[in-house]
From Swiss-Prot:
Protein name: Putative antitoxin VapB14
Key words, A-Z: Toxin-antitoxin system
Entry function: Putative antitoxin component of a possible type II toxin-antitoxin (TA) system. The cognate toxin is VapB14.
Keyword Coiled coil in annotation: no
Keyword Zinc assigned: no
Organism: Mycobacterium tuberculosis (strain ATCC 25618 / H37Rv)
Regions annotated as coiled coil: none
S-S bonds: none
Pfam families for the chain: FitA-like_RHH (PF22513)
Amino acid sequence: MIRNLPEGTKAALRVRAARHHHSVEAEARAILTAGLLGEEVPMPVLLAADSGHDIDFEPERLGLIARTPQL
């Protein structure tokens, strides 16, 4: 198994393996094989991965302001 994976990545791998009725090891092999063969990884899988980095959302710095919706 791959060592030092973030806990969120491990959890996502366990969920994906269960969804595909695979062991965690078999799912990891399938992901690596697909990645090396150029198959795209679905966006939800990428978003579920915990990269270990936090992103700060700063609306003011981005120039975003609240607006009243026009109905």
